[in-house]
């Protein structure tokens, strides 16, 4: 069996799809379906069972057995960078992750988890080293602290433990994310409503490492298949502009004039204006597949979003 926490969410459901593509259907999805719309991410996928996240962690703490587990992909977390309830974030993202990590270590189950580029904060160097890490929000701090915890444990770990610092992920199965969905998703919706696509004023100076979710899932699967341990950036290695995203959306639809809107006050000083993954460490594992450019990935995503 393979366990995917957050399996009804954005990246988790894409990992389930990648596992299905390998012929694996013996998958336990763990999630919180209080937002019932997330079920749609699983409708076209095959899984063996579903478990609520609170019931699951209670079983983990109790030491219950789930049979033979080939791997755990831990994608479940509060991923809202705008959430400021630190007690909630640390319980949900940090304590939960530690319990699951130790369960896997005790049983030598390969453990792959979602970290984040939010661990870096306001830096121009995105390398997996302590000197470049300075998160700007409590979400980023929760991910950073778990990475630090993992770093201390890795030398003694007898089974793979692997964290991925996701950069700006976009693509299919993010519809439920609301305001936290990708720029491409929001621009597509604006055009469908007959509006012009909108970018924040000043965003011409912002550049992000936008990475297609299919590529993210592929790296997760490859690292599992190859027994990789460590903490790795997962982006494309190239920063592209928000304008490049908007241009790709407009090109797909064949209409729309890009407008600018004021930059939100609540995001000032808490917003990463630039991200670009240093992929040196990931490439050193032997992973050599290319990543989709914004033009390629957004075109594929638009075709998926607007499929009939």
Swiss-Prot record:
It holds the Pfam family Epimerase. The keyword DNA-binding does not apply. Gene3D superfamilies: NAD(P)-binding Rossmann-like Domain, UDP-galactose 4-epimerase, domain 1. Substrate binds at residues 168, 179, 186, 200-203, 208, 271. Its cofactor is NADP(+). Binds 1 NADP(+) per subunit. It catalyses: ADP-D-glycero-beta-D-manno-heptose = ADP-L-glycero-beta-D-manno-heptose. The keyword Repeat does not apply. NADP(+) binds at residues 10-11, 31-32, 38, 53, 75-79, 92, 143, 169, 177. Keywords: Carbohydrate metabolism, Isomerase, NADP. The active site is at residues 139, 177. GO terms for molecular function: ADP-glyceromanno-heptose 6-epimerase activity; NADP binding. Pathway: Nucleotide-sugar biosynthesis; ADP-L-glycero-beta-D-manno-heptose biosynthesis; ADP-L-glycero-beta-D-manno-heptose from D-glycero-beta-D-manno-heptose 7-phosphate: step 4/4. Its EC number is 5.1.3.20. Signal peptide: none annotated. InterPro entries: Epimerase_deHydtase, Heptose_epim, NAD(P)-bd_dom_sf. One of its GO terms (biological process) is carbohydrate metabolic process. Belongs to the NAD(P)-dependent epimerase/dehydratase family. HldD subfamily. Homopentamer. Catalyzes the interconversion between ADP-D-glycero-beta-D-manno-heptose and ADP-L-glycero-beta-D-manno-heptose via an epimerization at carbon 6 of the heptose. Contains a large N-terminal NADP-binding domain, and a smaller C-terminal substrate-binding domain. This is ADP-L-glycero-D-manno-heptose-6-epimerase. It comes from Haemophilus influenzae (strain PittGG). The lineage of its organism: Bacteria, Pseudomonadati, Pseudomonadota, Gammaproteobacteria, Pasteurellales.
